[in-house]
Amino acid sequence: MSHPLFKKHQALLDQAIIALKERKFFTPYPEHPKAYEEGGNEEGKASFSKKLNTNYLGVAEGNSDWIGEEISPYWQTGLGIQYPKENPQEVINKAKSAFEIWKNTSIKSRAGILIESLERVKSRFFELAYATMHTTGQSFLMSFQASGPHANDRALEAIAKGYEELLEYPEELTWTKPMGKFDLALKKTFKPVPKGIGLVIGCSTFPTWNTVPGLFANLMTGNVSIVKPHPKAIMPIAILIEELRNVCKENKLPEDIVQLAVDTVKEPITKIYAEHSEIKLIDYTGSSSFGDYLEGLQKTCFTEKSGVNSIILESAQDLKSTCQNIAFSASLYSGQMCTAPQNIFVPETGIETKEGKMNFEEVLSTLTQSMENLVTHPKMGPGTLGAIQNDNTLVNIDAQGDFGGKVILEQLNISNPEFASARIASPKIVVLNATQATYQEEFFGPVLFVIKCKNKLEALQKIKELAESKGAITCSAYTLDEAFEKKIEEEMNSVFTPVSFNFSGPAFINQHAAFSDFHVTGGNPAGNASFTNSNFINRRFVWVGNRYMPNTL
């Protein structure tokens, strides 16, 4: 008998499965705030404000120890929110108990429970937006979209793909083999057996969007999860976990299928969990160094690490619109997106456009002007840049000075009229030569390198080598040469890097759409997993077949 919540959400699940196969645009969660209830913004803001300087309830029970150190990048003051601090072994013990029940919960029941939790989260999108804004530094609109509709899309995608994979084979059948004068009949069962307890490690810049794919993939496949958020960005994922636990409680299922494990910067606990023998699965977003350590633990590990994203600018229909697109992509959230471009490779002889040949200096001039026009715009500038999440981001960039190149645009003095104390920085633009090593490392945050190359072939060679050795989540190319376009596609795809060609207008390299785009390929050093393909799901469980002779039935 189907769970009532499965029946309630079956139509949506069916639509999501179809969308996965068709790869067309699909979302049950519109991304614009105006699509939601009038008054939702005020209610969400009020709900967020009420939680400031309080203990966050709803993510654990019976705990008296509380910690928290979140700071708003806009206010430059602490939020004062405290979260329950629990002993790791006790958390794992509770996860083990919950696993024994959850793994035996039917596939349909799991799907219904999980989709219902997303519908509950939907009612808190505005609160989530303010929580995200004041922990990550994203603008309000980006916070609303990334932690609300877009995160829900990714979670639903994981549920749908999980449901599909779990039903790949029949649950039970009678297998008959003709043997001449008689038939051999066996009863066979096929069980997707979950691996156990998963650890989902969040990041400080996208605390829900990057967390929910692994979390919901774990839960859908019968595993339980411990979520270890970044200590500076806890509240957004705490809201989601609260709703998940509420739905479980209402349906007489263990709330501890998902638990929040918090720590501080000075007293981290991630390694305690990661190295524990009961942790079987790890999902991680963050630096390559820590990601490499996690992968070395020899557990089932799904990583999104750092990479060096590049653009090759060989020719373009319109240089101005091209540079405007690049400037926005590099400025969005001050370059703190894993999909943001860092390097632009340009032939030293310039590029062809519909208006004729543009020399290298003209390309630089158009790019810097586009960047300056965007970030100094009184409305577009602050909303595009957002705020810097971590002080160290600016410290690391400032420490590099001119990066050994020629600075053609310094960081500009940008202010946000709504938040006078906001930590804001526009991208610095630096020109380098192709022989320099500087651009071959990731510099997280507001910096953009323009690399002067001998020709387009050297540019492509450098980009390919970078993707293969350092990893790349995105790659963008501008060319009017169809043969060269094909060559770029073949060369970059051979190192498992996707390419976005000739983006302009509202199409930006930063954006990956759920149900259509794969986020990270899993084939280069930027990460070993992809949101959301079959491999992202079916490594979380093992197919086990049992056989029964008729007289044992």
What kind of region is each of these model predictions?
Residues P236, I351-E362:
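Short, flexible/disordered intra-domain loops and linkers
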Residues T438-Y439, G445-K454, E458, I463-E468, ...:
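C-terminal catalytic subdomain
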Residues G78-Y83, S97-N104, G180, L199, ...:
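Short, well-ordered beta-strand elements within core beta-sheets of diverse protein domains
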Residues L166-C323:
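Rossmann-like NAD(P) dinucleotide-binding subdomain of oxidoreductase/dehydrogenase enzymes
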Residues M1-N63, V91, S143, S147-P170, ...:
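C-terminal segments
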Residues M1-H134, L412, L432, C453-K454, ...:
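Short, structured beta/alpha segment
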Residues S47-F48, Q89-N93, E100-I101, A111-F126, ...:
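Long amphipathic alpha-helix in the N-terminal Rossmann-like dinucleotide-binding domain
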